[in-house]
Amino acid sequence: MSASELATSYSALILADEGIEITSDKLLSLTKAANVDVEPIWATIFAKALEGKDLKELLLNIGSAAAAPAAGGAGAPAAAAGGEAAAEEQKEEAKEEEESDEDMGFGLFD
């Protein structure tokens, strides 16, 4: 990640922490105050990507998404030993896991 991307990311986090709407103008103002040269396109991209999203909620979801595969992976040996009913339960869990992973709000151009 380049310095300009990193500075823009930090600027977005600062604005979100203060409860201020994230716009390209505000991102550019913060990066300019930090003496970091950022091309206006980066501020626009970040602002559009985060438009209408709760950045704090996105950050909270990252931790829970990372824990999900570990819990699902532990059920595989039990499914093999438990027979057909356990295998069916495993398929249901996998399907639920796939559905929950479909849209976590991380799309760049949503």
Curated annotation (Swiss-Prot):
InterPro entries: P1/P2_N_sf, Ribosomal_P1/P2. GO terms for biological process: cytoplasmic translation; cytoplasmic translational elongation. Transmembrane segments: none annotated. Keywords: Cytoplasm, Phosphoprotein, Ribonucleoprotein, Ribosomal protein. One of its GO terms (molecular function) is ribonucleoprotein complex binding. Belongs to the eukaryotic ribosomal protein P1/P2 family. Component of the ribosome, a large ribonucleoprotein complex responsible for the synthesis of proteins in the cell. The small ribosomal subunit (SSU) binds messenger RNAs (mRNAs) and translates the encoded message by selecting cognate aminoacyl-transfer RNA (tRNA) molecules. The large subunit (LSU) contains the ribosomal catalytic site termed the peptidyl transferase center (PTC), which catalyzes the formation of peptide bonds, thereby polymerizing the amino acids delivered by tRNAs into a polypeptide chain. This is Large ribosomal subunit protein P1B. The lineage of its organism: Eukaryota, Fungi, Dikarya, Ascomycota, Taphrinomycotina.
